[in-house]
């Protein structure tokens, strides 16, 4: 244990990389990348197809000039002279869905503005490479304010910063939550019966369906994990049964209880990450009415109040950072700006646009357009802690890390072959695709999610463990064999906020996740009981056979007070931030948008992303965001109306 502990105390640092994202414009199938000077663009499409033969050089050059003329009306702005029916702020999960659905009507012009780069990294495609994505140039690298209740710690909050957003950087887990989650929203038109068909429409499930709960014709690929650790996964399942859990064959089937142990389905396609860029946006980039700009940071929504009412006219953005020229993208008559920047940056940008609590806006000299107290409030995330244990010496080499890497930190040839030839093996896994949902105190819905990892954390902060793993690999060090159980308060009671630090839209947001601030202490109790539950599982006959003591919390952490202190000092985000532009019924003063996702007090402005979720569903939030975007697209195109419910299944359990 001494060598393990010494490694666990080593400080990890993420690999250094160029953080300046290159600007990319995608329009009518053309891929345009910046060359020198910075404002001029040259097409890369021909370069991708191979070198142009010398005899065709002049015609290729003429074609390039024509491509540029089609995209640029002047030398400074890729959108000058254009008007759009829909401007999507952000190119993440929801925006990819909307861009696909809205641009299907060739008469509508759609613009997507993404602050980050294109989605071309190999690390995004390979699920196991998630260790390289946190705190990387593909992440916003956001940290909270010091949290007094968490031993004055800052919390790192991962958010994807590229086309596809967090669907390109998350753990790929596919969770809808339970039917009761949506019924608890209490918003007209968004009950479990209303939303189920939109989950099904989005999905092509390789292992379930088609049926009442799963689809076979949607863009989003979902499948069972293609890596199994036969010894450790089997031992965990047996151990969970020993402590009283029953198996759950499908956590997304609402006809039975959400609790139990089992396999978490993943958003993958034959073992490759199936992020929403690849599933929704990339296949339609050839549409001539769809334009996508990367490296385009929106700074505010342009809103006109001259006619006595607030009307969105377009957005202001920069393709050259805080010192760059502020450019404008304009709406066509009747067009709409749709905020898809996520639960952190959507409220952040709304406030910079004058939409938010008037006192805060006035503090920073921002003119108030719509005084909405709820903007940036109601932040909900699922806080987590973990237990970790090494395996006995005779089982060294049993972990997922051993199946991928050799003792020098090099990827095993067998792992590469399994991945490339069959889409199987350790490289297809983010490590946490088995687990459980548990009621710790008889709640109607499980309050605890357990992610079982057949690999050992060397940091009590689960996200820092991923970062540390990448450091170990780069230094050619062997990662010790063991297991981890990440314990998540999946239906938290605590809430936090997103605020401003200045009037500068390039300054980082003021983040406070608010973990463990609920007045009844329910979230802390859930995590404390989760630690006890995980220890019971580790002591079971099925799992104790493999384990050699406990690394975290450690043998010295015994009493509830000691466990609570451990939780406060190690609690971390499970990266499921929602709720900061809450959807609500008429008369709900805390809401920011109505049940059609329209921002109160501003015409031509909607929010379609995780911000609108009134109460976070149990489980990861990628699938619910896709559902919301699918439904929003249908509302915008007139293919659906609020109040028309999907056919209910025969039985819908809470």
From Swiss-Prot:
Give the record's family classification. Answer: Belongs to the GMC oxidoreductase family.
Gene3D superfamilies associated with the record: FAD/NAD(P)-binding domain, Glucose Oxidase, domain 3
| Uses in biotechnology | May be used in light-driven, bio-based production of hydrocarbons. The oleaginous yeast Yarrowia lipolytica expressing FAP from Chlorella variabilis under blue light conditions produces odd-numbered alkanes and alkenes, which could be used as drop-in biofuel.
What's an example of a GO molecular-function annotation for this chain? lyase activity
What is the protein name for this chain?
A: Fatty acid photodecarboxylase, chloroplastic
Give the range of the organelle targeting sequence: 1-62
- Species assigned in the record: Chlorella variabilis (Green alga)
Pfam families given for it?
GMC_oxred_C (PF05199), GMC_oxred_N (PF00732)
